[in-house]
Regions:
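Selective recognition of specific alpha-helical transmembrane segments in multi-pass small-molecule
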Residues: 175-190, 206, 216
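Small-residue-rich segments of transmembrane alpha-helices in multi-pass membrane proteins
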Residues: 108-112, 171-180
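Early transmembrane hairpin of solute transport permeases
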Residues: 22-157
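Conserved, well-structured core segments that form the ligand-binding/active-site neighborhood
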Residues: 151, 167-175, 187
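Short, Lys/Arg-rich, polar N-terminal cytosolic tail immediately upstream
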Residues: 1-24
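Cytosolic juxtamembrane amphipathic/interface segments immediately preceding
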Residues: 16-34, 162-170
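Conserved small/polar residues in nucleotide/adenosyl-binding loops
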Residues: 204-211
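Juxtamembrane interface elements at the cytosolic ends of transmembrane helices
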Residues: 145-162, 189-201
Length: 216
């Protein structure tokens, strides 16, 4: 007796799709990417909690304090957090644990550079919403870019058979090279070529006019 269509479909999901998806998600780059996003979820949920709180707060202004600042410095910092955590988790998944913190901090520096802030009379100004969810696609791209630079340098195995240079000096050089390259290459794109990544990412991630008309 042949299996019912639904049973065939369930078997296909269980024995074909599930193993393929599991194998895909176990790849170091994919695992690091997903882990970087998951680690930022508590900050997203904190912001959501404040949004719900702000619905109730205006009805009891004399009792409940305004907690918008909590959301501003958690959820509204999401892109900055992603820029750090993306590199941190990728370095862990790729077995470059000595680069996790330095790589993550470089991700933050690179993301701030990509924000294209302006300095006037010693005052640095940048669009506030670029810290938050608005810039998350740019933050992911920056995180992956920095991860690639650090991964390529790590694969060179600098000073592998060198015992003459002190170990702490070796660590300095191993860190300086990927930091320098990450910021230098991005500086050429952002400052010298005057490229703003935000409109580019928005162009490719926002729905097309046709999609918007269909959703109405």
């Amino acid at each position: 007796m042949s299996k019912k269509p639904m049973q065939k479909f369930m078997d296909w999901l269980q024995y074909k799709v599930t193993p393929a998806v599991q194998k895909f998600t176990e790849r170091p780059w994919v695992h690091g990417f997903s882990a970087g996003i998951v680690k930022c979820l508590p900050f997203i949920l904190t912001g959501c909690l404040i949004f719900f709180y702000n619905v109730v707060q205006p009805y009891f202004p004399n009792i409940l304090p305004n907690l918008s600042a909590v959301s501003n410095y958690t959820f509204s910092m999401l892109s900055l957090l992603v820029a750090f955590m993306m590199v941190y988790q990728e370095m862990g998944s790729l077995k470059h644990r000595n680069y996790q913190v330095v790589g993550g901090l470089t991700g933050i520096c690179a993301y701030i550079l990509a924000m294209k802030g302006t300095t006037v009379d010693g005052v640095y100004s940048v669009t506030w919403n670029r810290f938050g969810p608005t810039g998350i696609v740019v933050a992911i791209c920056i995180g992956l870019y920095v991860s690639i630079i650090f991964h390529l340098i790590a694969k060179l195995n600098l000073f592998k058979n060198n015992n003459t240079i002190p170990e702490f000096v070796q660590e300095w050089i191993k860190n300086i090279i990927p930091i320098f390259l990450s910021i230098l290459l991005l500086k050429i794109v952002i400052i010298d070529l005057d490229v703003d990544l935000y409109p580019i990412c928005l162009l490719y991630t926002s729905p097309s006019p046709r999609d918007r008309s269909l959703s109405r």
